[in-house]
Amino acid sequence: MNSDDNVEADASSNIIKDSPKIKEQENTSTVNESDVLATSTTASSGVKRKRLPNDLVGQLRDKIQENPNDISSWYALVEEYGSKGKHEELRETYEQMLRPFPYVPRVWVDYISSELAFNDFHAVELLFSRCLVKVLSVDLWTLYLSYIRRINPDGEGQSRSTITQAYEFVINTIGVDILSGPIWSEFVDFLRSGPANSTWEQQQKLDHVRRIYQRAITTPIHNIEKLWRDYDAFENSVNRATARKFVAEKSPVYMAARAAMRELSNLTEGLRVYDFTFERKYTKVERIAYSRWMNWIKWEQSDPLDLQHGTMLQNRIAYAFEQAMLYVPLCPQIWLDGFSYFLSISDEQRALQTIRRGMRYCPSNFVLHVRYAEHEEANNRTSEIRSTYESLIAALAREISQLDSKASSSSESSTDGNPQEKKLPEHLVKRKSRLVRQYSLAWCCLINAIRRTEGVKAARAIFTKARKAPYQSHEIYIASAMMEHHCSRDPVIASRIFELGMRHFGDVPAYVYKYLSYLIAINDETNARALFEKAIPRIAADEAKPIYQKWLDYESNYGDLNAAIALSQRMAVVYPQESTQAIFLSRYGLKDDAEEEERETKEAEKIRELSVRLNGGNGFPGHVHNNREDDEVSIASTSSKSNVEMEDTRLLPASLELANTQGASNPPTSALPTVPVPLPSIITEFLDELPAPQVITGPRIQPTKLIDHIIKSDIPFIRLRNANAHLKRARFN
């Protein structure tokens, strides 16, 4: 058992020792979290044997061995043993089932219920000690309360005290859950039903009931409205004179909790299901589910109950994280955010437990492992750094191997009799490419970590091991070469490593570009020129352009002019779509003026089109009347149609209004130059306050259609005094 398992076991022991009737046993077995992703439920992995048609148990075990995460096969096996009353086989099956599912509430509830059915209370208490504080599920904790009440009759004084302690234990742990309402109600009913043999005992009882009521009505739970009515009736039954005072004091927090309950109910409705607990599906529905879980956590972090960053707020946020970890444990973001949150509240122990648990559920997740390793290294704890990276590398290699196996099986399933190329669907090809890159980056991270903690010599040994690995990309060679250059200050070794990588990645543009840049940086012109001439024929022209440009820049700035001209002519042949002038200008970091002018012309045309629409169809700004009052702008018009057009622009600044007061003295539209009209300051200020376009996820609005609709709409004209000031005031109110 590793360190965080010991910590969790100790915490479980302390709480359960304080809870009634459950004593922690020294030899109690705890959940072995290293078996979370067990690859098999049997020790042997021999050839699959043929089963008889009536051998249902054997068939189910074969299915489980093929896919340990097949929860339906597990439950079919449980049902088979349960229907035949085979207690030991049933118990063994549940224990095997807990290896891949150590935190699934349903499994623990069913396992404990089966032991209760056989009246094995000792086994039940051991199971509760293993799971209770690790699995924060209302169903599991309700079962715990039922067990406590079952073994403690209400009539005895000590039993009542034990049950009271159990209820306090439960509501302190999961009382923030919106589904915990029935537990609060049961606790209140239990307290109110208790005997009181003296005035002092009666007062103690009333105070206890009041305290639980007041906690319940400030918690967003489903039955909060009923509890509020019950609390009101309770206070009035005790003392009408003080009832109004108590109720008035709690009314504001109750209203806030009720509003929060409604929001939380919408957020969590249908959320806690097992559809995404056992296997990643990489579907849109799964992404939506993950997003909903994140929305719940963000909602709790927004502090809707105005708890002011206290312990209660931290408990609520932590509980939301715990629920997400139970139901969507294969979502890496949950573990990363949980780790960051617990660190932010200075709870490093819980943060480490969270990220270690996440690494077991997501063994091939790059970010989780690197984040953990860097945290440990930053805190001078280096014992687990190497093993963390090595486990990540092994997990990524397994995933890549599984994808290769899929490709092999698809090629073998060819029906035309011809050997078929190993081929994966496009989305799996992309996934494999991403995994291979992460695999290489994991080696790079390990090399750097070992160099920092053990020295360059140890890092070289890691590189030697990495370049012999079955899956690799060019990043490994780049990382090792640059380490030698910067840390050993030996460009010769770095160049040798780069050259070694050329054997495998000489046709990879990114690798050649990096190698060429390095040779230029160390002023090795001879080898740089040789590399360029050797690599260019092996790379497709469309991918080689950055390499051409890099060498052209070097020749233009530091080489021979004739060589630069010759290379420019060579590029003109390779890239006929590029103009000779554009290639020439690129030597000086400039762009083709013709292309720039074309772009600027298009932008100016767009501005002119906008100004035409803003001016009601006329392509020029008219004469401006500068009257003292903003709303006393007189506009001479010769037709009712022009009056309507003027009304459409009435609230714009005068610089955009068409003034036609001079009648025939004004030149015709075609006689005036069409120039871009600057937007009014009030509009530019408004545009500055709008969010960036990339954050808008809703339907897009077509601006031109919107302007057309506004222009064509029959909007009644309202003359306002100081219209500009009115508009500004309306925006800020």
Swiss-Prot record:
Residue ranges with Polar residues bias: 27-45
Region (Disordered): 1-45, 404-425
GO cellular component: chromatin; cytoplasm; mRNA cleavage stimulating factor complex; nucleus
HAT repeats: 85-117, 119-150, 158-193, 204-237, 269-302, 312-344, 523-557
BP terms from Gene Ontology: co-transcriptional mRNA 3'-end processing, cleavage and polyadenylation pathway; RNA 3'-end processing
Alphabetized UniProt keyword annotations: Cytoplasm, mRNA processing, Nucleus, Repeat
Main location: nucleus
Biased composition (Low complexity): 404-414
InterPro entries attached to this UniProt entry: HAT, Rna14-like, Suf, TPR-like_helical_dom_sf
Places the protein is found: Nucleus; Cytoplasm
Pfam families: Suf
GO MF annotations in UniProt: mRNA binding
Task of the protein: Component of the cleavage factor IA (CFIA) complex, which is involved in the endonucleolytic cleavage during polyadenylation-dependent pre-mRNA 3'-end formation.
Designated name of the protein: mRNA 3'-end-processing protein rna14
Organism (species): Schizosaccharomyces pombe (strain 972 / ATCC 24843)
